[in-house]
Amino acid sequence: MNPTLAGKTKLVDWIARLAAAAIMGQTLFFKFSAAPEAVALFEKLGVEPWGRLATGGFELLAVVLLLVNRTASLGGLLTLGLMGGAVMSHLTVLGIEVEGDGGALFVMAIVTLVAGAITTWLHRAELPIVGARLETQA
């Protein structure tokens, strides 16, 4: 973990990381078990089954990276990419509300995107290649 994180910042960091990991983690069962809801969603996107399984694999990797202090920056970055794709899918193909969920999937994607952004920002100095430059500009 970034040694400069202290007090409330460290708490915000852990809340963001745990929230993102919990939200992505709870969807893994549905993706890997081919739950009808997940299959229907990825069929609508035109990427069933490979898109569902690849997304599940990358989300599992993001969860692990988020929960390990040394890799939190990469987990946050991967979360940003995954949830950016999820939000764009909702805005362009799926719609805000999917199968009568009242927009719950969309809201969870937004919350996870924000949590990933917070994590990435707080751990920006640890990002490979660009981290040192980002830290000096902040």
Give the location of each predicted region:
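Solvent-exposed, well-ordered loop and adjacent helix/strand elements within mature globular domains
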Residues: 22, 26-53
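Extended, low-polarity transmembrane helix blocks
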Residues: 1-27, 70-138
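Glutamate identity and glutamate-enriched acidic tracts
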Residues: 37, 43, 48, 59, ...
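Core segments of alpha-helical transmembrane spans in multipass integral membrane proteins
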Residues: 26, 47-64, 80-81
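Membrane-helix exit/interface motif
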Residues: 30, 36-37, 53, 62-65, ...
